Amino acid sequence: MEIVKVCPEIHVVMDIDSGLIAEMRKDILVVDLHPVEEQINKLAYFAKALENSLDPRNAPMKSYKGRDGTYKTGGLFQGMFFGFWVTMSILVLVTILTIKMNLSLIGL
């Protein structure tokens, strides 16, 4: 909201947006909220991007076109990676326990 002092001696101002002419009062503070609104819109954009990142079907905020499903693919490969190593560790433990239980398997 922008104001123009029409007559500073008698404290008359005009609101540019509405064209309203009124008396300026000392107990009312006029603050420009446009910079605050811009920051709020920027934070809302980042909040929406964070919310979209929780859904694996959406693309990341700063990515090239056609990158939909990258979170889904990444989650799939992460599961395969950790599943492989967990399976290998269980297989090694079972092998060690089998050898300890039956030493005739290795010729002792």
Curated annotation (Swiss-Prot):
Catalyses:
5-methyl-5,6,7,8-tetrahydromethanopterin + coenzyme M + 2 Na(+)(in) = 5,6,7,8-tetrahydromethanopterin + methyl-coenzyme M + 2 Na(+)(out)
Function per UniProt: Part of a complex that catalyzes the formation of methyl-coenzyme M and tetrahydromethanopterin from coenzyme M and methyl-tetrahydromethanopterin. This is an energy-conserving, sodium-ion translocating step.
InterPro entries the record matches: MtrB_MeTrfase (IPR008690)
**GO terms for biological process, alphabetical:** methanogenesis, from carbon dioxide; methylation; one-carbon metabolic process
Bilayer-spanning residue ranges: 79-99
Give the EC number(s) listed in the UniProt record.
7.2.1.4
Pathway where it operates: One-carbon metabolism; methanogenesis from CO(2); methyl-coenzyme M from 5,10-methylene-5,6,7,8-tetrahydromethanopterin: step 2/2
| Species the sequence originates in | Methanococcus vannielii (strain ATCC 35089 / DSM 1224 / JCM 13029 / OCM 148 / SB)
Cellular location(s): Cell membrane
The molecule here is called Tetrahydromethanopterin S-methyltransferase subunit B
Keywords carried by this UniProt record = Cell membrane, Membrane, Methanogenesis, Methyltransferase, One-carbon metabolism, Transferase, Translocase, Transmembrane, Transmembrane helix
Cellular component terms (Gene Ontology): plasma membrane
Which Pfam family is an annotated match for this chain, by its short name?
MtrB
GO molecular function annotations of the record: tetrahydromethanopterin S-methyltransferase activity
Its assembly, as annotated, is: The complex is composed of 8 subunits; MtrA, MtrB, MtrC, MtrD, MtrE, MtrF, MtrG and MtrH.
Against HAMAP family, the record matches this protein to:
MtrB
State the top-level EC class: translocase
Per UniProt, what is the membrane topology? Single-pass membrane protein
Transferase keyword on record:
yes
State the family named in the UniProt similarity comment for this chain: Belongs to the MtrB family.
